[in-house]
Amino acid sequence: MMRFTLPRDIYYGKGSLEQLKNLKGKKAMLVLGGGSMKRFGFVDKVLGYLKEAGIEVKLIEGVEPDPSVETVFKGAELMRQFEPDWIIAMGGGSPIDAAKAMWIFYEHPEKTFDDIKDPFTVPELRNKAKFLAIPSTSGTATEVTAFSVITDYKTEIKYPLADFNITPDVAVVDSELAETMPPKLTAHTGMDALTHAIEAYVATLHSPFTDPLAMQAIEMINEHLFKSYEGDKEAREQMHYAQCLAGMAFSNALLGICHSMAHKTGAVFHIPHGCANAIYLPYVIKFNSKTSLERYAKIAKQISLAGNTNEELVDSLINLVKELNKKMQIPTTLKEYGIHEQEFKNKVDLISERAIGDACTGSNPRQLNKDEMKKIFECVYYGTEVDF
């Protein structure tokens, strides 16, 4: 038996934030990131709508990029003191991911990260609170997914938590929030969304339920990402919806080694998640094409790329990704990103071992061992061809 899970309600469109005034509840904890939502006036809007709904609100502010276990535990403690019946997270992937993990430890203070680090080990939630997510970036799609990524900086380990219990109850996908993204963030989050859609389409758990969502997302991202990077508002809106569709796909089909690699190098080398995915994606497509040639070729055909054979179509898809990276000033290798060679050599065995153990590796369409993972990392560092 397989399962397909989404939030109960997704409100979308410009101005959909207003839906918050219809929320039923008594107390809400609002979890925020670095301050951009306040600067652009969206926090005041949310507070105003929640006041109309008669809901008392407290804020948790300053969730850092790649949130830490410490941030999660502090937030969970504040929730236990305030006892909200709604947890509302607004911002990029980081505050929403952090709020999901806070939710777990708010409802289950006896648990530790070791208890929930394996997929589908999160206990039942919603005994104390429901969860509403409002994304401001067009990439992570954590507003519709069963995932949350939390970092333990002391051990340099990223925990990709995975459980349908942490799928939000409500998502508000208002593209006005995404209009505030700077170009670099637009590029990184957009490539994250493209990676989500492509990996979901070839993942071992892809299905007739996830394939249309993934393919529609790929088509929309192909059409709108670069225009969005250049600041086109209509393209920003379409990218906000595309990343959400990609999220619905990968939350159910799961991902692959592009994300495994990004998780582990994000923790060790501090590469922004979307940037890491963008760098790895061409190399991973090449590696996986040994077993998924037809699936990748189908993507290339659907977006009208050149090629008379499956091999030529897949090469066109790889070149499309490379061209997008180039146009949006994303490095093509880890060396170009700025990681020193000796540091890479010192850490490559560690990150290879950890990437093999990542939750996303199991659903990659081509299975691999630590030595093969290391070889891919080396190809990505030096920019050499994946020919194995």
UniProtKB/Swiss-Prot annotation:
The keyword Oxidoreductase applies. Coiled coil: none annotated. Disulfide bonds: none annotated. It is an enzyme of class 1 (oxidoreductase). PROSITE patterns: ADH_IRON_1, ADH_IRON_2. Belongs to the iron-containing alcohol dehydrogenase family. This is NADPH-dependent butanol dehydrogenase.
